[in-house]
């Protein structure tokens, strides 16, 4: 079976989609966003296709497309959509699969189920994206604790933003996990610049093995 990698984050708006695009491009993978909330601006799937350089057929259609830009549980209620979390199964594809969640681990899909509940059922290796700015130590260590409490395999932490060596070091030490690399902020964000930045900061094979 090809590698299946879940990309999640400590919070929303930290650059998780940009990282997912870089990872999918580096692995020549297929990308899937199960639930998209908000359709007026560019969707995450659209951004990943634009930034990854992948062909359109490598971007799988979302299982749910919700018009309202809100947490999926609320967006679904406003839009009159019932999200069947039991039907959210990882697609079977012939190459690596990068799956992106929404916001953080505890974002609700319904009034009863959060993303981390689905991740635990999938039991696929997970990459935790974390910002490097003030407050990241607490948010990231809490996220790692939640992941470990559910026996989800954690590949490591991908840091996003400006260099903050002490915060990055204390997170991997106290979290007993790997620092996969750090994707810096890019003045010019396009497919070529993102590909170069990812290649300089990450080793693709770190994402293809079993979680340590």
From Swiss-Prot:
Residues binding ATP: 13-18, 100-103, 184-186
Biochemical pathway: Cofactor biosynthesis; biotin biosynthesis; biotin from 7,8-diaminononanoate: step 1/2
Binding-site positions, Mg(2+): 17, 100
Subcellular location, record wording: Cytoplasm
Gene Ontology molecular function terms on file: ATP binding; dethiobiotin synthase activity; magnesium ion binding
Disulfide bond annotation, renumbered to this chain: none
Listed Gene3D superfamilies: P-loop containing nucleotide triphosphate hydrolases (3.40.50.300)
Positions of transmembrane segments: none
Catalytic reactions of this protein: (7R,8S)-7,8-diammoniononanoate + CO2 + ATP = (4R,5S)-dethiobiotin + ADP + phosphate + 3 H(+)
SUPFAM superfamilies: P-loop containing nucleoside triphosphate hydrolases
GO cellular component: cytosol
EC number: 6.3.3.3
Key words, A-Z: ATP-binding, Biotin biosynthesis, Cytoplasm, Ligase, Magnesium, Metal-binding, Nucleotide-binding
Similarity comment: family membership: Belongs to the dethiobiotin synthetase family.
HAMAP family: BioD
Subunit and partners: Homodimer.
Protein name (record): ATP-dependent dethiobiotin synthetase BioD
Source organism per UniProt: Rhodopseudomonas palustris (strain TIE-1)
């Amino acid at each position: 079976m090809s590698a299946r990698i879940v990309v999640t984050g400590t919070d929303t708006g930290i650059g998780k989609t940009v990282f997912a695009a870089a990872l999918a491009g580096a692995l020549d993978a297929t990308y899937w966003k199960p639930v998209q909330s908000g359709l007026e601006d560019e969707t995450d799937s659209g951004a990943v296709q634009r930034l990854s350089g992948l062909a359109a057929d490598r971007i799988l259609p979302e299982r749910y497309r919700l018009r309202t830009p809100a947490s999926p549980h609320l967006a679904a209620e406003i839009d009159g959509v019932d999200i069947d979390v039991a039907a959210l199964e990882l697609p079977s594809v012939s190459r690596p699969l990068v799956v992106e969640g929404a916001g953080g681990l505890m974002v609700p899909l319904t009034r009863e189920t959060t993303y981390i509940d689905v991740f635990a059922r999938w039991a696929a290796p997970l990459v935790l994206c974390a910002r490097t700015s003030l407050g990241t130590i607490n948010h990231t260590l809490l996220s790692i604790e939640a992941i470990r409490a559910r026996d989800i395999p954690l590949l490591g932490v991908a840091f996003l933003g400006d260099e903050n060596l002490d915060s990055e070091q204390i997170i991997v030490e106290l979290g007993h996990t790997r620092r996969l690399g750090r994707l810096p902020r890019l003045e010019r964000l396009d497919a070529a610049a993102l590909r170069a930045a990812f290649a300089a900061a990450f080793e693709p094979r770190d994402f293809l093995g079993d979680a340590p």
